[in-house]
Amino acid sequence: MDPVIIGIGGPVGAGKTQLVERLTRAMSEEISMAAITNDIYTIEDAKILSRTSVLPEERIVGIETGGCPHTAIREDTSMNEAAIEQLKARFPDLQVIFVESGGDNLSATFSPELVDFSIYIIDVAQGEKIPRKAGQGMIKSDLFIVNKTDLAPYVGADLSVMESDSKVFRKDRPFAFTNLKTDEGLDVVMDWIRNDVLMADLG
């Protein structure tokens, strides 16, 4: 059975790499995983994952996309597709491959030909009105995450406002609030992977 491909998108600094690091660490005993990172001119995120993640270095592939990072996850996904095939051949037991996009704007989305499910992550420091802007990444993702909840008091963000706005544009689609620095809310994301992603794939 092919692994499930989960895309992770969001602006620069929102916590995409940290989310992959935390998920792979927390779920390493139950799921066989690998990760692909997309950066414009470097493979810095892949290097960070190699240092901080429990994933062996050979299970992490860094891609230098050049130009606009959203092109590699939507218009021309060939580099990511090649990396996925490389990981599948190298590790036949893989159950989940995370594809982290380069930092991009609120409208960036993954091609449905590339990923099976997508996560879009923002952080509280971008302001409580961000969910109200309802960019395509936030609307169309299978899971929406508001990260760095611990910063709310320092940036004047009201989490209850962000939650109510998220409910409006997400409708029946799930969303979560996290502080990945302490793993607060990570259990919600892991349950989503277990119940919505892996169980759906079995179905």
Curated annotation (Swiss-Prot):
InterPro entries: CobW/HypB/UreG_nucleotide-bd, P-loop_NTPase, UreG. GO terms for cellular component: cytoplasm. The keyword Ribosomal protein does not apply. Disulfide bonds: none annotated. Keywords: Chaperone, Cytoplasm, GTP-binding, Nickel insertion, Nucleotide-binding. The keyword GTP-binding applies. Transmembrane segments: none annotated. GTP binds at G10, P11, V12, G13, A14, G15, K16, T17. Pfam families: cobW. Gene3D superfamilies: P-loop containing nucleotide triphosphate hydrolases. One of its GO terms (molecular function) is GTPase activity. GO terms for biological process: urea catabolic process. It is found in: Cytoplasm. Homodimer. UreD, UreF and UreG form a complex that acts as a GTP-hydrolysis-dependent molecular chaperone, activating the urease apoprotein by helping to assemble the nickel containing metallocenter of UreC. The UreE protein probably delivers the nickel. Belongs to the SIMIBI class G3E GTPase family. UreG subfamily. NCBIfam families: ureG. HAMAP family: UreG (MF_01389). Facilitates the functional incorporation of the urease nickel metallocenter. This process requires GTP hydrolysis, probably effectuated by UreG. This is Urease accessory protein UreG.
